[in-house]
Every structure is written in structure tokens, then in C-alpha cells.
Amino acid sequence: MSEHFLVTGGARLTGNVAVTGAKNSVLKLMAAALLAEGTSTITNCPDILDVPLMAEVLRGLGATVELEGDVVRITSPDEPKYDADFAAVRQFRASVCVLGPLVGRCRRAKVALPGGDAIGSRPLDMHQAGLRQLGAECTIEHGCVVAEAKALHGADIHLEFPSVGATENILMAAVLADGVTTIHNAAREPDVVDLCTMLVQMGAEIEGAGTSTLTVTGVSALHPTEHRVIGDRIVAATWGLAAAMTRGDVTVTGVDPEHLQLVLHKLHDAGATVTQSDDGFRVVQYERPKAINVATLPFPGFPTDLQPMAIGLAAIADGTSMITENVFEARFRFVEEMMRLGADARTDGHHAVVRGIRQLSSAPVWSSDIRAGAGLVLAGLVADGVTEVYDVFHIDRGYPLFVENLQSLGAEVERVS
């Protein structure tokens, strides 16, 4: 039997929880270290499985990587390898973010098409199109993205969708291109802003971080730096949603609440009392949550990564909720597992209609990705009896000390091998 969690329902979560660095940021920052010869130091790194996996990818490219507590030191060689290890890259999606730095620094790259979460198609078309506009030839050969450029030049790039990954890869190539690159319809996520901050610290010239238009003036070389990862807004919001679901009282620190304004507004709509500070927020839920309507959108919209938790909240809310998924088409696979727990839910295309019931019922369930796994554990907290959650390695990829943090808040959760 694979490692799984036993989740006993009924506990009201109370207490304080501190979040560490953002998963969606740290992996791109690690890749960015390839852009400069020498040693870059990244602090506030989360203790998640994807960090050592990314370290293996970087080592395969010739870098030296040291992991010590929440600190990662990456020494990039004078001539990095350009062929990313197939076995390492295939394990998780974010590994494709080495594509931009390799094209920028080496003028060529060979990166296996990535693996990761089963939440639907996430093609690399926009990544390739942007790199082509910068002067690279990009093809798919034998399961790999192959890119090569004699020279990189600035370009006026219009993204069809504000893709975080495409924005970041194009950005990391453009910082070492000749001339000015403008990325229109760029992703505005805090993780992209964090990457821009580190790149500027390395000597890049970037304007417009946090807006939909990024202007990059290429430079001849970057230098190493030290950078602190922003707090993980998805992990922080997960704890806030858990407080609302269990009628709890949870204070979350280590995150900028400005990164979560719409989520905190939705928690207020659900009946929670939400107070904010410079370093976090507090969620107190006294009564049964109210139904909410949520539509996932790129930042500053409601994050698609929190859609499973929103469905979990809707499942035990008073009334009928409408959850609309506008980013990843296969994310509603999670609903089938929620129905095992007794949720009254149905899906129709991009929409899920959830009629709240007072309590879910325990059952064995399987997580298909990081956020679905976390959502199922939260659902288990409001189910009667003991819920078994399987394939929890997904959760370990994105949530540091998940079981330990839940236990510190009063949840009865056990990891079983």
C-alpha cells in the first residue's frame, strides 16, 4: 500500500501557521541563477520535493547546488551544458523554466517535455513562439524542445494568454538579447514580479513588473545575487480556506496579503471575519460557511490552484455555489473524488455546480495533483469518520510540513506508510 494520510474529521482548526517561500517562485529563481556565472544564494526556500528535483536538473546542466535548511546556493559554470537531463525534467512541470535561461546564456537548449500535475493540457506553443521572435529556431524532436539561436535580438511579443511560464521563459532569454523586448499581455502574478526583482538585482533592465506590459533592455552579462523568495500565497490561502471550512480561527504569517485580495474577499463572502496585517491575515469563521461563486482567472483573479479548496468549501456551505474554471480544463477531475465523500456536485464544461450539505462522509480518495490532494485533505477535515487520502506525494511537492502544520492547528491527521 502506498504512503497515504488518515484524516479524522471534526476538529476546529485554531492557532498560528507561518508560510515559507512560494513554490511557484523558487523553482524559476533557481533556474534564473543559470544566467550568471558564479554563486547565487536564494533564501526562504520551501521544504518541498520539487526543490531537490530542480537541483538535480541544474546539476545536470553543470551547476553546483547546495541545499541547507531554507537556503539554496547555486554556482553556475562559465559554460553551462545545454541538454537538460530527461529523467529529471520529466518529473515535474516547472523544469521547463530552464529553457529561457539556456537560450539566453548558451544560445541553445534541449529540454525534455515536462511532466507534473495531471490538470490538463499546458502546451509550450507560446514559449516557442516568443523565443522564435527573439531569433531562436525551436522544434520538438524526440520528446524534447530543441532551441538554437546564432544571436538573440529584441522583439515586440504579444502573448495570446497571460501565461506565467511563457512570460518567464521569454523574460529570461530577453535579458541577454540585443536590444529592447516588449512582452504584451504578460502575466502579472507575484511570482513573475519576484523573478523580475531577482533579475534586476543580477543587472537586468526590466520595466513594468506587475503590469501586463514588460519592457526588457538586453544587457551583455548578468552577475550573481542573493534573493529572498516571497511567501507562498497559495499555501497561505489554503490555511485560510481550511479555517473557514472547519469554523476555525487561524492566523497566517509570512505572506503579503496584497497577493490574495480576491481570495480574502471571497472568504468574507463566505461569512468569515478576515483581518489583515503587513505580514499576513487572520480568518475566523463562527457559523456554517455561506455559498460562494468563484471564477478562476490569471492574477489578480482567483487562482486556479485554489479551485479544489473552493469546491471543498462550497461542498459544506449553506446554499448552491457556482465554480467556473477558466485556466486548466481537466482540473474538475477533483470533483469525482469529492463525490466519493458525498459532495452534491455536477460539472458541465468549465462549470461546477455544488449544492452544500452539512457534512461530508469519509471514504478512500486519490489525489491527482498537488492542489487536489490538499483539497481532499481539507474535505476530510469536515467529513465524519476517517478519510484515507492516497498519492500524497503530490502534496509533498507543494506543501512544506503539511501534516505537521495541520497537527499544530489541532487537526487529527496521520501519515501512514
Curated annotation (Swiss-Prot):
Q: Which SUPFAM superfamilies match?
A: EPT/RTPC-like
Reactions listed under catalytic activity: phosphoenolpyruvate + UDP-N-acetyl-alpha-D-glucosamine = UDP-N-acetyl-3-O-(1-carboxyvinyl)-alpha-D-glucosamine + phosphate
Q: Under which EC number(s) is this enzyme classified? A: 2.5.1.7
Biological process terms from the Gene Ontology for this record are: cell division; cell wall organization; peptidoglycan biosynthetic process; regulation of cell shape; UDP-N-acetylgalactosamine biosynthetic process
Q: CDD domains, per this entry?
A: UdpNAET
The keyword Kinase is annotated on this UniProt entry: no
> Which compartments is it annotated to reside in?
Cytoplasm
Q: Which residues form the active site?
A: 117 (proton donor)
InterPro entries on file: Enolpyruvate_Tfrase_dom, Enolpyruvate_Tfrase_sf, MurA_subfamily, RNA3'P_cycl/enolpyr_Trfase_a/b, UDP_GlcNAc_COvinyl_MurA
Q: Which GO terms describe its molecular function?
A: UDP-N-acetylglucosamine 1-carboxyvinyltransferase activity
Keywords of this entry: Cell cycle, Cell division, Cell shape, Cell wall biogenesis/degradation, Cytoplasm, Peptidoglycan synthesis, Transferase
The enzyme's first-digit EC class, named in words, is: transferase
Q: Does the keyword Transmembrane helix apply?
A: no
Q: Which family does it belong to?
A: Belongs to the EPSP synthase family. MurA subfamily.
Its protein name is: UDP-N-acetylglucosamine 1-carboxyvinyltransferase
Q: Which organism is it from?
A: Mycobacteroides abscessus (strain ATCC 19977 / DSM 44196 / CCUG 20993 / CIP 104536 / JCM 13569 / NCTC 13031 / TMC 1543 / L948)
Species classification: Bacteria, Bacillati, Actinomycetota, Actinomycetes, Mycobacteriales
